[in-house]
Structure formats: C-alpha cells, structure tokens
Amino acid sequence: MDLLLLLFSAIWYILPAYVANAVPCILGGGKPVDFGKTFFDGNRIIGNGVTYRGTFFGILFGIITGILQHFIVILYMGPETVFDYGLFGYIILSFLLASGTLFGDMLGSFIKRRFKLNQGQSAPILDQITFIVFALLFAYPFYPLATNSIVLLLVISPIIHFSSNIIAYKLHLKKVWW
C-alpha cells in the first residue's frame, strides 16, 4: 500500500479517538470521575483532570466525528470505498474509539497517581500512548485494522499528541506544554 494512502487511512480510522482525546481539554471541567476520593495508597484515584463533563463531551464529539466521516465518505468518496462502514458502523466505531481513548486516559492518570505524579506532571510515553492503545483495543475486535496501520499509528500518535499539546498550550487551553 502506498505510504500516503496508508497514512491517510490510518488517521481516518483513528480520527474520532484524536477528537475525543482533545475535546476534554476544551470542554472539560466540573466533577472529577473519582469524586475526589483517594486510593488505599493515600493518593487520589485519578485526579481532578478527568471529569464527567470532559468524558461526556469527548465521547459525544468522537461520535459526531464518526457521523461526519460517514457523510464525507458518501458525498466525496462514494459508497464503494474501503472507508464505508455505513452510518451505524461509524457510530459504533467512533463510540468504541472515543470510549477506549478516554478509558486509556483515565488509566494513564491512575498509573501516574500510583507513582505520585500530580496532575499536569509529565510521564513520557504514558501520556502519549495509553489513549491510542486503548482506542485500538476497544475498536479492533469489531473493526480490525491492518498491522502496518496499527504500527504507523503507534509511531505517529505520540508526535501528533505532543504537537497538539504545544498548540493547546500556546492557545492557553493547557497549563503545561507536554
């Protein structure tokens, strides 16, 4: 497969996860999913950075992205394309990707708290990769992706994540650049 087509198809597949990962930074806040509770080690279970509002809007906008993808496929690519999962398929795929993304983010926060890292402290690789790994784990059993696409996503996602964090920091949407 041509590298450019491979890149496009991999990003097209994972786009709802990228959106779901970014939206809580903009629309999050409010009640944390751990209700402010501490784990048996005395540290917060997850922390203030993962909220119900951010989780809800992350999943919602991930699904909206999937719905938009469906209509883009129909309008510009035609129904006889590799990207045509159908409307219901896009809704399910985007829900799985968005849910996996936010679960991965929660798990990453949980692990960081176990290592006594506060919200906003950097945990290289963990910060950049858990969301994509869990997005793929949630979606892959129902919507498999070629191995070369998975490898490509595992390589480019940390770069995209890092770059988008710098942009969010410059736009004053994040307090730290990582």
UniProtKB/Swiss-Prot annotation:
Ranges that cross the membrane: 3-23, 56-76, 87-107, 123-145, 150-169
Family: Belongs to the CDP-archaeol synthase family.
The species this protein was found in: Methanococcus maripaludis (strain C6 / ATCC BAA-1332)
GO MF annotations, alphabetized: CDP-2,3-bis-(O-geranylgeranyl)-sn-glycerol synthase activity
Name assigned to this protein: CDP-archaeol synthase
EC number of this enzyme: 2.7.7.67
Involved pathway(s): Membrane lipid metabolism; glycerophospholipid metabolism
Pfam families, alphabetized: CarS-like
Membrane topology: Multi-pass membrane protein
Function: Catalyzes the formation of CDP-2,3-bis-(O-geranylgeranyl)-sn-glycerol (CDP-archaeol) from 2,3-bis-(O-geranylgeranyl)-sn-glycerol 1-phosphate (DGGGP) and CTP. This reaction is the third ether-bond-formation step in the biosynthesis of archaeal membrane lipids.
Cofactor: Mg(2+)
Record GO biological process: glycerophospholipid biosynthetic process
Keywords: Cell membrane, Lipid biosynthesis, Lipid metabolism, Magnesium, Membrane, Phospholipid biosynthesis, Phospholipid metabolism, Transferase, Transmembrane, Transmembrane helix
GO cellular component: plasma membrane
Gene name per UniProt: carS
Subcellular location: Cell membrane
Catalytic activity annotation: 2,3-bis-O-(geranylgeranyl)-sn-glycerol 1-phosphate + CTP + H(+) = CDP-2,3-bis-O-(geranylgeranyl)-sn-glycerol + diphosphate
